[in-house]
Amino acid sequence: MRYLFNRSISSIPASASLAINEKAKAMRAAGKDVITLAAGEPDFDTPDRARIAGIRAISEGHTHYTESRGIRPLREGIARMLREDRGIDCTADNILMAPGGKYAIYETVRTLIDPGEGQEVMILNPGWVSYAPIVSAAGGVPVGVELTFEENYHITRQALEKVVSPRTRLLIMNYPNNPTGCVLSREEAACIADFALDHELLILSDEVYSTIVYDGAESVSPASIARVADHVITVNGFSKCAAMTGWRLGYICAPREIVDMVQMLNQHTMSCLSEFAMEAALEALQCKDETAAMVESYRHRRDFFVAGLNAIPGVTCHVPKGTFYAWAKIELDGKNSQEIADYLLEEAGVATVPGDAYGLGGTCCIRMSFATAEGDLREALRRMDAAIREING
């Protein structure tokens, strides 16, 4: 039988980071020694107190349907955290839970964009691999905002103005940034706020790495700027801050009218989250010491890993101020990012993500996670150094 599929879905490319991980697993299964730096996941387990809270909830029978918005104690806890830590003026009624930050982004874009109308969504380039496919799946048109390695990918009004049009509906931004590790300064946030107001745009601010910052850096939430707050949908979750990737716990914080409308999609596509997972998340909000310990461990690994990369001929890597990614530009006999990633995997046994997966701004760049065991990171540096020197000398 010939199956017919929705073109907006069938045209979506596979996730490059997941594809690389699968290839690395297959190589390992075939007996090859591969170090994986491609995963976007903390290498810590969920804090004990959060796990215990989830187990206790299951034992007490908290395994039934619950509110589609999410249990109120969790939404109140998230709102309190956003007020105190992110400067966002909100209440529990501004919070909507979702099965992961990725779905929170999809259902928000799906709610705001009219398919078939040619409505455009601006995304940072380079930017996370799933933004453009999500926009396309929702019926929108993704448009890249080109940022440069030379300027360390800092966002500018000029870059935004180059691509905005009368069809632009939404700007998706992500700080701290995956893949570059760049953070958003207060001046840059103010610039974006003015841009959104001048063009009457909404902002979707993905802040899933907001707790992972270094060297006293601050990554500002646009929703903390009062004059633009009613234009901002903030997306966050528990995957990165509390090492809860498998629990699938995300949320949006937005004006009540937007939350109410997105909830309609929630009700008809996923009903509600698991109550025991949400009770674990409620406890995770109290795990700030555990989060701080994770971040300090990432900082230590960042310091030696980035220094090691910059010691390799032909490799340049800015020191990331946030996330747990190193974004390196590699000059290797004219190879593009896919060819570089393939070479490192085949010749060095090191799995990385090619920069082209993050947009044209990723040409000749690769993303590597340093949320990996220190011994593996040091061995990966040794292998990459040897493989790159074979060509660069």
Where in this protein do the model-derived segments appear?
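PLP-dependent class I/II
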Residues: 2-5, 13-15, 20-34, 41-57, ...
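Substrate/cofactor-recognition hotspot
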Residues: 9
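A glycine-/small-polar-enriched, mobile loop at the entrance of the PLP active site in fold-type I
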Residues: 38-41, 56-75
